[in-house]
């Protein structure tokens, strides 16, 4: 069972003050069946193109969280039901999107955490453009590959180190 993000914040106030632990801006909504998730970050930077998102989710997730910096675009969705199912089937703990998702009923049926800014019915482009395994700027914090992501109904936390057993 995952420790609630609020409890992690309370237990690590010194690391919050130093910046070793950061709280993302409270702009993300939970769309997946699993509201709480945690794992090391795998990162992507894309813009209105989810080709690399699919490529990453086709790989074994090994308990990681895919962090997608979609530039905050609200003009199309970067993750939908098919990609959430792919994430679930391949062992990803969660997907955190600085952008939109779609197929919200399908997302709610997938046993994977999905947090995003909003829902949008339009699909994205498929040009396979973007960068992977780089630091990404998410609302409220910069995230490096391998940093720990903790998400639940109360928010999203980023840590340089694992905060739980």
From Swiss-Prot:
The protein's name in its UniProt record: Putative 4-hydroxy-4-methyl-2-oxoglutarate aldolase
List of residues binding substrate: 80-83, 102
InterPro entries hit by this protein: RraA (IPR010203), RraA/RraA-like (IPR005493), RraA/RraA-like_sf (IPR036704)
MF-aspect GO terms: 4-hydroxy-4-methyl-2-oxoglutarate aldolase activity; metal ion binding; oxaloacetate decarboxylase activity; ribonuclease inhibitor activity
GO annotation (BP), single: regulation of RNA metabolic process
Cofactor-binding details, from the entry: Divalent metal cation.
Pfam families per record: RraA-like
Top-level division of the source organism's lineage: Bacteria
Cofactor or coenzyme needed: a divalent metal cation
Keywords recorded for this protein, A-Z: Lyase, Metal-binding
Record's function text: Catalyzes the aldol cleavage of 4-hydroxy-4-methyl-2-oxoglutarate (HMG) into 2 molecules of pyruvate. Also contains a secondary oxaloacetate (OAA) decarboxylase activity due to the common pyruvate enolate transition state formed following C-C bond cleavage in the retro-aldol and decarboxylation reactions.
Catalytic activity field: 4-hydroxy-4-methyl-2-oxoglutarate = 2 pyruvate; oxaloacetate + H(+) = pyruvate + CO2
Similarity annotation: Belongs to the class II aldolase/RraA-like family.
Class of this enzyme: lyase
Subunit structure: Homotrimer.
Source organism of the structure: Ralstonia nicotianae (strain ATCC BAA-1114 / GMI1000)
């Amino acid at each position: 069972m995952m420790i609630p993000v609020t409890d992690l914040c309370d237990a690590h106030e010194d690391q919050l003050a130093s910046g070793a632990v950061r709280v993302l801006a409270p702009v993300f909504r939970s769309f997946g069946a699993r509201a709480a998730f945690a794992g090391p970050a795998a990162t992507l930077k894309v813009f209105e193109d989810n080709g690399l998102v699919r490529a990453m989710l086709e790989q074994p997730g090994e308990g990681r969280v895919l962090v997608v910096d979609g530039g905050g675009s609200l003009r199309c969705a970067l993750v939908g039901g098919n990609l959430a199912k792919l994430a679930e089937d391949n062992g990803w703990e969660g997907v955190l999107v600085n952008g939109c998702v779609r197929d919200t009923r399908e997302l709610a049926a997938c046993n994977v955490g999905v947090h995003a800014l909003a829902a949008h019915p339009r699909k994205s482009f498929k040009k396979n453009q973007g960068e992977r395994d780089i630091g990404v700027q998410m609302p409220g914090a910069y995230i490096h590959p391998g940093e720990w992501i903790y998400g639940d109904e109360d928010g999203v936390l980023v840590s340089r180190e694992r905060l739980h057993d």
